[in-house]
Amino acid sequence: MSEFATVARPYAKAAFDFAVEKQSLEQWQNMLAFTAEVTRNEQVGELLSGSLASETLANTFIAICGEQVDEHAQNFIRVMAENGRLLALPEVLQQFIQLRASLESTVDVEVISATELREQQLAKISVAMEKRLSRKVKLNCKIDKSVIAGVVVRAGDLVIDGSIRGRLDRLTDVLQS
C-alpha cells in the first residue's frame, strides 16, 4: 500500500462524491490520471517537494496541466496544494478508481498467460470470475512467458495461480522443506 493511502482517502472520496453528483466520473478519472502522471515527472516531483508557497505551487501545477483540468479540478488542486498533498495524486487516482468500481459493481481482473488467449477462453474466465466475485469483471490481459503455460488470475487480494511456473515453485518449496 502506498505511503499516501491514508492521506489520499479523503481527497479521493471528495473527488468521487463530486464526480457522482455532477455525473462526470469518466472526466474526473481522466483528469486524475493526467495529474497523477504529471506528478510522476521527475522535474515536477522536485518542484512539488520544494519549498514554494502553496498558492504559487498550485498555480504552477495548474499551468503545467493546462487545458486538461477544468475549473473544478483546479479548485481541487488548489486545496491539495494548500495542504501539501499534490504528491498523493497517484494514490488519489487509485482510490478513485476503486470507489468507481465499487459503485459500478465491477472489479478489474488481471489475467497473465504465456500466450495470447482466445476469446472463448477469456469468456470462460470472465464467467467464472463473475460467479466467484459476484460482480462484473473487466479483464486486463498480459502476456508473460515466465508462466510457461496456464494462467495466473488476480483480482484485488485474490490470486489464482494455475500456471506451470506456480506449480514448479510449489514443488520446489515442498522438496526443500
UniProtKB/Swiss-Prot annotation:
Source taxon at top rank: Bacteria
Membrane topology: Peripheral membrane protein
Keyword vocabulary terms for this entry: ATP synthesis, Cell inner membrane, Cell membrane, CF(1), Hydrogen ion transport, Ion transport, Membrane, Transport
InterPro entries given in the database record: ATP_synth_OSCP/delta_N_sf, ATPase_OSCP/d_CS, ATPase_OSCP/dsu
Entry-linked Pfam families: OSCP
Keyword presence, DNA damage: no
PANTHER family per the UniProt record, alphabetical: ATP SYNTHASE DELTA CHAIN
Role played: F(1)F(0) ATP synthase produces ATP from ADP in the presence of a proton or sodium gradient. F-type ATPases consist of two structural domains, F(1) containing the extramembraneous catalytic core and F(0) containing the membrane proton channel, linked together by a central stalk and a peripheral stalk. During catalysis, ATP synthesis in the catalytic domain of F(1) is coupled via a rotary mechanism of the central stalk subunits to proton translocation.
Official protein name in the record: ATP synthase subunit delta
Organism, as annotated: Photorhabdus laumondii subsp. laumondii (strain DSM 15139 / CIP 105565 / TT01)
